[in-house]
Amino acid sequence: MDFRIDEFDVFEKGDFMETIRNVEINQLHDFKNHPFKVEINTELCELMKSIEKEGVLVPLLVRTNPYGDGDEVISGHRRKEAAVWAGETKVPIVIRELYDDQAVVAMVDSNLHRENLKPSEKAFAYKMKLDAMKHQGKRLPEASSVDDGEEHSMINSNELLARQVGESVAQIKRYIRLTNLIPK
């Protein structure tokens, strides 16, 4: 059974307009300063074999490349690499219009769940996400519900990031300090 996308579709998802289509892999560019490395390992080889058999089943998340032509990969760097190794020339993508800070948060969030992340990858990812969160606003409501007239306590970006990733604020700060020691 072949699940490849031949046409494209446009739809609304929450606050975003998204387009799904197939594109040439050479029109996709890696996310600027992407902190996660695509390593050739057993998992990537298994993904490559799956793509050879079924194609890319989950579209890559991209945005229009703000630095030139083509599209910038937000999520799916491993799928893109495995597709190249599998001999694919096109992959399905979801194009989402994202500002820089939104793109950073989406890129980091889509990769932090992976097993075997290196401390250096976490360090740069936490730093990038924290910087993006700070650009969006320094103090955030602790509750994400609609204002119901109740008084909400406020938390800063460090505390919110720590809660989101299951680390302490001190541990987040230790990871981020690593970025001063590690060359990019």
Where in this protein do the model-derived segments appear?
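Short Lys/Arg-enriched helix C-cap and helix-to-coil transition segments
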Residues: 183-184
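Amphipathic, charge-rich alpha-helical segments that serve as recognition/docking helices
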Residues: 36-38, 44-45, 81-179
